[in-house]
Structures are given as structure tokens and as C-alpha cells.
Amino acid sequence: MARKKYALIGAGNIGGTLAHLAALKGLGDIVLFDVVEGVPQGKALDLSQCGPVEGFDANIKGSNDYADIAGADVIIVTAGVARKPGMSRDDLLGINLKVMKAVGEGIRDNAPDAFVICITNPLDAMVWALREFSGLPANKVVGMAGVLDSGRFSHFLAEEFGVSVNSVLGGHGDNMVPVLEYSTVSGIPVSELIEMGFSTKEKVDEIIKRTRGGGGEIVALLKTGSAYYAPATSGIAMAEAYLYDQKRILPAAAHLSGEYGIDNLYVGVPVVIGANGVEKVVEVKLSDEAKANLQVSVDAVKELLVACKGIDESLA
């Protein structure tokens, strides 16, 4: 059987961590792409020299040529400018939209059969633009945010309830619309634990607020960059679900065609990821409060797309 091929577009902190994780897990050969000459080559060489020590034999290549991503089974896109302290995701829109155009065209021309995972921010707008520029089917282009948000939410809930993180399942969409009925501790919904007196709604609301600002909290602490370990781990989880046909339910920014009453937008929802990409959007029952919060998120995404179309008329 031919070895699988990963193309990682963007050789920054997330891209480098993705390459290391993919090699350690034996997921296949890796192309690390970046427009800056020397950076992907240097990181690829450094990572390759880990192989004899860590026991992997992945072929890791650094490249500045999109032709080298040809035949990739999975492409994970992290290219773009990272947030700096005081910078909002919306500030990134104009810069990263141009990056998505170049990346989308590179994928279209060299790896049109790949499953594409976008991590670049602002996520909901960038994954939409990437699909538009690449022309790939909507089920083969997805955004990574919900897995990361769920990981952060689960970590904070585990701290609150004093349990193992493995005992917590966080289920909620991108742009942070937590659905507490589907977030459980050892199988018990968080909403019921609040009713039982194990925590308070005020405390859980604080956790939700901290999760919403989870990326910004790390940016403020690092001062010179943004999170990369957890985002990379989340991207690999999505890639594995596709490559191994796991039919795994994961929260992701997926293209909606009427689900949740939303059409032609990328919004964070639970989806089934398997060998056909996004195989199904899981429509869970939402409370009136969750529906209202989801609509706020949808309206924010729509505003970003209007801005995108104003920047690049080909998207209109």
C-alpha cells in the first residue's frame, strides 16, 4: 500500500508541530511548504534528524513550490499572519484573505483530490474563502476550531469538577456556542451537575468566557506568538478521522446547506468525518438560548464574508 502524503501549508509554529506529530504517529510522508525560502527546508531537515532518535522513518521535505504538494491525501493550512497582542481576528482579514487566494489556487492546480483542513484565522471566513478559491467540493474542505475549543472547554471543566480530563466531553460549535446538555462529566450533563449543586451557572459561565478567550489568553502570555501545540493536535485528530475512516463525530467549521436553518456558510457544528470527508452534519436539538447565540455567531460570519467580498471581487 502506498504511503499517505501530508502537505502542510505554512511552516510556522503550528506547521512545524503538525509535521512532528504526523511523523511521530507514522501517518505518512510530509511536505512542509512555505513561501519564505529556507524556513520549510530548515525545519524539515531538523525534523528528519529526529527520526533516528524517535524511531520514525517519514520522508519530510521542505518546499517553496506548490508542485510538491501534488498527490497529497491531506492538506492542513496554517499559512497567514498570526495574531499579536491587541490584534483581533478581524484585523487579520485583509492580509490572510490574500494568502488564502494563493493557497487555494495552489491546491486547485496541484492537489484537487485532497481533504483540506484550514486553521488560519479568522477561521470561518478563511475556510469559506479557501473553498471558493480552490473550487474543491464542500465536503472536502473543513475548518479546525471546534476540536480546539472543546479541548479548552474540557480542560477548564475538569479543573472545576476535580476530575480527569478524560472524564469530560465538550460538545459545542465554533464561535463558542456551548451546549451544556451535550457536555458531560463521566456521562452526566454539565447542566444536570449544576442542578445537583456540584457547580453554579455563574462559575460555568466564567469557564465559557475563559474558553471564548482561550486563544487570546495564550497570546497575552506568550507576547510574541499564539497557541500551536493544541491547534496542531486538533488538526491531526481531524486528519486521522479522514485517513482512517473513523466516522468520528467532531465539532468543526463545516459548510452548511440548510442544516440549522443556515445556507452557504461555514459554521462550527458537530460533523461526522470519515473517508468521504465531512460525511454528515449532526443536527442536535438546541435550546432557545443556544439558538439565539448561534444566530449571533452566524451574523458575525456574514459580516466577515461581506468584508471579504469587498476586498476581493471574485468572491462576490
UniProtKB/Swiss-Prot annotation:
Entry EC no(s): 1.1.1.27
One BP term from GO: lactate metabolic process
Gene3D superfamilies tied to this protein: Lactate dehydrogenase/glycoside hydrolase, family 4, C-terminal, NAD(P)-binding Rossmann-like Domain
Binding positions (substrate): 89, 121, 152
Active site location: 172 (proton acceptor)
UniProt pathway: Fermentation; pyruvate fermentation to lactate; (S)-lactate from pyruvate: step 1/1
Binding site for NAD(+): 34-39, 121
Lipid metabolism found in the keyword field: no
InterPro entries: L-lactate/malate_DH, Lactate/malate_DH_C, Lactate/malate_DH_N, Lactate_DH/Glyco_Ohase_4_C, Malate_DH_type3, NAD(P)-bd_dom_sf
GO MF annotations, alphabetized: L-lactate dehydrogenase activity
Keywords of this entry: NAD, Oxidoreductase
Catalytic activity: (S)-lactate + NAD(+) = pyruvate + NADH + H(+)
Subunit details: Homotetramer.
Homology family: Belongs to the LDH/MDH superfamily. LDH family.
Protein name: L-lactate dehydrogenase
Organism of derivation: Botryococcus braunii (Green alga)
